[in-house]
Amino acid sequence: MSKVNMRALLESFSTVILSIYPLAKSTNQQSHSHSLSLTQFLYETIRRSRVDYTTLLLALYYFIRFRDAASSKPTNYIPLLCGRRLFLVCLMAATKFLQDRSFSNRAWSRLSGLPVDKLLVLEYMFYQCIDYRLVVPKHIFARWSLLVGECCAHATARYDSTDPNVASFGSVAQYWVSLFSNVQSSLDDLFSIACLTKIAHRRMNANAALKNQATRKPSSSPQTTQDSSPILTMAPSTPVSVGSTPPSTPSVLPIAKQLAPMNVCKAHIQASNQSRTLTTASPPEQIPLMEPQVYVNPQVLPGRLSSLSKPVSLPPTPSSPKVGVYRPMTSKSNGGVAYCYNAQKLNNATGPVTFNMPFASVLPLAVSVSCDLGTASAYVASLPQPCSQKRHLEEDYSCLTEHSAKRRSYF
């Protein structure tokens, strides 16, 4: 990574960290003088920890999640309202979540200079604030990557520009601070969708311009430059210098109103040669940031599977299943589909049970019939009276004893 890209990356990360400062001001927290600037602190922490870009993105997303969780009671998390401490704790959580072998707390203590006991207290306070929700959905992480990537690209364009009329990134950093201050962690509100749509429009227009320029002759092709204007076109009321503090964060509604006059486009996707390409003939009306993800509802899935006699193709569940979530079984026989059995069907069966269901519960099924009752007559005698069709019940017991070993082998 070049020095310009590294500097732009640090500047964009600093804007995300500055977005929590209004929360720190609401608790009347005093500002302390530090020996290192925020950018220098980020550079030293990243250099010593040797983390990758994905870990940094996840750590910055934990910033937004912590800010939304602590906004209701910020006085309970005053030690974490420092940008340096919170960045260190978020980086620790992201490293431990993504990597199987990460640094210990003692190593993080030597890296940061904080005592181990203080790091443990800060880490526990952070986990308690976000309710131990470290998992980020795929579509949310894709949107967050697009948002932070645009900020990095904007900073890189400012540093690479040799035009003296182009202002530095420090003069427009206040717009990005206000953007990250109003973005919610879910990234599905009106303001977040408006910003993401505008970013997607800009990138599509830049790609279309480059494609048109490549098709023309070099002599007649005009020189086009990428638009480096900020996402928020809000002019500050007073001139702000590079070293001054950013103005107070505006509300979400005025910024969203300025982003309102924007044509949301439709995406015309053509399937050719088993690949999807975006057509540039007509303007797209919807930006497909991610392909739609279909998830299985665990409350509807058992009843649906019990009513089907043929295997169905359902999307797999996440890698870390929760209680009550269904996951696919390994294929063993019968054309690659493994047999599994339902407890209710087994208890009410009148013959050999061969339900062809491709999914089985993670938890063991609680079958009310045990196989140590002795004989079939003892099993029938244990049932409440009056009872009809005892001959079928005896057959039921024989079927259950035959399939009990098979049923246990699948779970």
Curated annotation (Swiss-Prot):
Pfam families attached to this UniProt entry: Cyclin (PF08613)
GO molecular function: cyclin-dependent protein serine/threonine kinase regulator activity; protein kinase binding
Listed transmembrane segments: none
One of the GO biological process terms: negative regulation of sister chromatid cohesion
Bias (Low complexity) ranges: 218-252
Cell division listed as a keyword: yes
Alphabetical list of InterPro entries matching this protein: Cyclin-like_sf, Cyclin_PHO80-like
Residues covered by region (Disordered): 210-253, 307-326
Alphabetically ordered keywords of this record: Cell cycle, Cell division, Cyclin
Coiled coil: none
Entry GO CC: cyclin-dependent protein kinase holoenzyme complex; nucleus
Family label: Belongs to the cyclin family.
UniProt function note: Essential for the control of the cell cycle at the G1/S (start) transition. Interacts with the pef1 protein kinase. The pef1/pas1 complex activates the res2/cdc10 complex.
Name listed for the protein in its UniProt record: G1/S-specific cyclin pas1
The encoding gene: pas1
